[in-house]
Design a protein with these regions (language model features):
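Extracytoplasmic metal-acquisition and chelation regions
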Residues: 15, 23-177
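Bacterial N-terminal signal peptides
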Residues: 6-17
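Positively charged n-region of N-terminal signal peptides that target proteins for export
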Residues: 1-5
Length: 177
């Protein structure tokens, strides 16, 4: 009888200990390039989940049931935004309602790249800078991470977001960023 009581006490102690330990947030990232940035910031803490796997393009991707489940469990979702991943707009509103959703294309200071012609960046000039802030970047190159300054700005946003969601690991995120 004492063995049974000791076993129950041990299981309760283990169970209570597990429930008080803070788990890392469930982080979902839309594309491989962004996943690389987020993985770097989360190194040593947790591994973010990649939504679009393989050689699939975010421009023509159809969300699978497994992807829907991943979004439902997400606490944080990083994506470029509707300009690149339009398929994600509705699922993020309906499936990831509880998640902190971060469109990295909206990061302050991001420079949207011009269309590439013959492997050379085209210009992305506007007559008025105010006109730049509100437009949807149609026709621009959405591969924002190719500009090192953009990548730095996105990493800063990733660090700040993860620190807000997971303050216990704030220093690790800062060190990795």
């Amino acid at each position: 009888m004492h063995l049974k009581t000791a076993l129950i006490a041990t299981l309760l102690t283990i169970g209570l200990g597990a429930s008080t330990a803070q788990a890392s947030p469930q982080v979902v990232v839309s594309t491989k390039p962004l996943h690389s940035l987020v993985s770097g910031v989360m190194a040593g803490v947790a591994q973010p989940k990649l939504l679009i796997r393989g050689h699939a393009s975010p421009h023509a991707y159809a969300l699978r049931p497994s992807g829907a489940r991943v979004l439902q469990a997400a606490e944080v979702v990083f994506w470029i935004g509707e300009e690149v991943e339009s398929f994600l707009s509705k699922p993020l509103r309906s499936l990831a309602r509880k998640a902190t959703v971060v469109a990295l294309g909206d990061t302050e200071g991001i420079h949207w790249l011009g269309l590439r012609k013959a492997l050379v960046w085209g210009s992305h000039e506007h007559e008025e800078e105010e006109a730049h802030s509100g437009h949807g970047h149609e026709g621009g190159d959405p591969h924002l991470w190719l500009d090192p300054q953009n990548a730095k700005l996105m990493v800063q946003t990733i660090v700040a977001t993860l620190q807000a969601v997971d303050p216990e690991q704030a220093q690790a995120y800062q060190d990795n960023g």
